[in-house]
């Protein structure tokens, strides 16, 4: 049975989803776990604030509940919005790109760094890293 890895763009910007699909295409040769990129159509155009991040939590969880066929989910937004809520509504693995990126970096070095795309995002990312208990390893 094919169990896709569902990569969810939680904003409504289809060009972001298309870009994700293009970047992931070279990894999409696994016949048992194809990669499927989807757009959360009722999300904001971009996740630029805490309000934007919070506004997609329930729509993300509701979407995850509609996909019992998925082998895993990836929340493709660096804020990892709704990761805990999504994990609470499925038995499938749910990965966030911030959590996955930071933890992978820490497997390779004692400290890590992050380049944010907007100043307004920095504090939100720092709060999440503190919650992950890795803020003291931020370079």
Specify the residue positions occupied by each region the protein language model found.
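N-terminal glycine-rich anion-binding loop in soluble enzyme alpha/beta folds
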Residues: 1-59, 117-139
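Glycine/small-residue-rich loop that forms an oxyanion/phosphate-binding "nest" at active or ligand-binding sites
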Residues: 57-110, 114
């Amino acid at each position: 049975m094919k169990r896709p890895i569902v990569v969810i763009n939680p904003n409504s910007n289809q060009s972001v989803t298309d870009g994700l699909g293009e970047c992931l295409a070279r990894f999409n040769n696994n016949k048992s776990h194809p990669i499927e990129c989807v757009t959360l159509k009722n999300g904001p155009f971009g996740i630029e604030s805490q309000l934007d991040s919070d506004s997609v939590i329930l729509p993300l969880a509701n979407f995850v509940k509609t996909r019992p066929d998925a082998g895993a989910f990836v929340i493709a937004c660096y804020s990892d919005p709704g990761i805990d809520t999504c994990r609470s509504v499925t038995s499938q693995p749910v990965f966030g790109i911030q959590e996955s990126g930071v933890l992978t970096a820490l497997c390779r070095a004692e400290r890590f760094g992050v380049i944010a795309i907007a100043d307004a995002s920095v504090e939100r990312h720092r709060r999440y890293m503190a919650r992950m208990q890795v803020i003291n390893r931020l370079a």
